[in-house]
């Protein structure tokens, strides 16, 4: 099954450099998964030279798209008969592109004051196993829930590093709490 913000399958994730173990799933690490997704998109663009084809392959896989191009003797993803999910996916990507290019035209108005302030985090490099992530969280001044919230790639209550170094994000306490004086009512 596909996991994380970028909905990567396990095989694709591993192919593009992500680690998946019993205690770690880097598909849920937004930064690492984004970098892996970008590597996939770059490879697909180098292969197809066409962004619609890249989008089709992101949904269906490069193997499937390459095979269908040959079987159907087609040159474009728009000329392929694909499953409905993939066809709809490509058109949704095209719609999102239009919205991003002209958000006001489609009724999307985001002002700076409407955006959430990012929560600053300290990065802690970990290269040894942690048997108790709850205790690790407490030692770093946060709850286990906050540790999981800011590090969704942690799959278990422990971290087995297997010789790798991982970066754990620790949110800064001063940024963690909602400040009501900064709130105003929208009419």
Role assignments for model-derived ranges:
Residues 1-17:
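Short, surface-exposed glycine/acidic/tryptophan-bearing loops
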Residues 15, 20-23, 27-46, 52, ...:
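Extracytoplasmic and endomembrane cell-envelope/extracellular-matrix remodeling and assembly machinery
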